[in-house]
Design a protein with these regions (language model features):
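The feature captures the conserved acid-bearing segment of alpha/beta-hydrolase catalytic domains
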Residues: 240-298
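Boundary at the C-terminal end of the N-terminal hydrophobic targeting segment
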Residues: 28, 32-34
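Bacterial N-terminal signal peptides
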Residues: 16-28
């Protein structure tokens, strides 16, 4: 138990470097311009007409810990639904602070413990990004994913994938043209709303990071939301064929097939992001080859300093040094006057 206390630019070049962390793959272009978003993406990701709800956020309570505090909010995330949000705030900060959204399955996971009870959650050891970032001086926010919020009558445990399936089926019945990944993206952008409105946050310095499911959410929301200035993702499947995009709670097999037939790839979203810094930490569901196959076509990857793939090739969960490289990438672009240097 824890004690509570647009497609222009020259051909992209790829540079591979061996490091102690694994293979670093960087992509760059001499010039860049934000693309328009292809219609297939708009159809799948745009919030459907009629999906309207009153925006509100309720502060529930605050927990205090040695290095940071955690504010607990309930935030409206759809017609008749709310998501729980944890915002971790570092101790000793002054002025307006940089902030990072940390999407994942549920908030406690990104802390590594339940702040209400002190119960440790060892399953998430090594990816407790919310706590890690607060200790680095960021305001960090995370929330429930929609499998926990869309069905208000759900009784399945939060880690039961039957709950994902039922939530996705309900979403598809209610909003036939939408996708699960569209809902995930919309809910993640609500975290950006909350951070941008927080008086403790410098709204010009907001980033996003995520692992696995959280990596998917971070990539989509980070590419689509201009308020996000830097994106870090970990092992989420940048190539259509390397992870479970066919599952109903993401795209569903028919929608993935249609996107592939139309020639759509995740390069479209990164091009639309217009050159904002992007880092992919690869390990199992991503690797250097799959990332290069997608990202070689992205003119908005300006240079090897701003568009980087680190392939640690050691499995799905990032080792500490790889995750530290991701944190330093955030530091580099959100704390320009700090002494942190990007891991090479």
């Amino acid at each position: 138990m824890r004690k509570l206390r647009k497609d222009t630019g020259k051909v992209v070049r790829a540079v591979c470097m061996q490091s102690a962390l694994g293979v670093l793959v960087a992509f760059g272009a001499v010039r860049t311009q934000a693309s328009t978003l292809p219609q297939e993406w708009k159809d799948a990701l745009s919030v459907p007409a009629g999906y309207a709800f009153a925006r509100h956020v309720e502060h529930v309570r605050t927990w205090d810990f040695p290095d940071f505090s955690v504010d607990f909010y309930r935030q409206a995330n759809g017609p008749g639904t709310v998501q729980r949000v944890f915002v971790a705030v570092p101790k000793g900060g002054s002025g307006k602070l940089p902030a990072v959204a940390v999407p994942f399955y549920y908030p406690e996971a990104m802390l590594g413990f339940d702040p209400a009870t002190g119960e440790e959650l060892p399953k998430f050891k090594g990816v407790t990004m919310l706590a890690d970032l607060a200790r680095r001086g960021f305001v960090a926010a995370t929330a429930d994913a929609y499998h926990l919020t869309y069905r208000t009558d759900a009784t399945e445990p939060r880690d039961d994938f039957k709950r994902w399936k039922k939530a996705a089926e309900a979403l598809a019945r209610d909003w036939r043209r939408w996708t699960g990944v569209g809902k995930l993206t919309a809910d993640t952008r609500l975290l950006i709303d909350l951070l941008a409105a927080d008086p403790r946050v410098d709204a010009a310095r907001i980033g996003i990071i995520g692992h696995s499911l959280g990596g998917k959410m971070a990539f989509y929301a980070g590419c689509l939301d201009p308020r996000v200035k830097v994106i870090v993702t970990s092992d989420w499947g940048i190539d259509w064929d390397r992870t479970n995009w066919n599952d109903t709670w993401y795209w569903g097999a028919a929608r993935v097939a249609a996107m592939k037939a139309a020639g759509r790839t995740h390069a479209d979203l990164l091009a639309y992001a217009g050159g904002k810094p992007f880092m992919l930490i690869a390990g199992k569901y991503d690797n250097a080859a799959s990332a290069r196959a997608v990202l070689d076509g992205v003119p908005s990857c300006r240079d090897p300093e701003r568009c980087v793939v680190l392939d640690h090739a050691s499995g799905h969960r990032p080792p500490p040094d790889a995750l530290e490289a991701g944190y330093r990438f955030l530091d580099k672009f959100l704390k320009p006057n700090s002494n942190n240097k990007e891991t090479k």
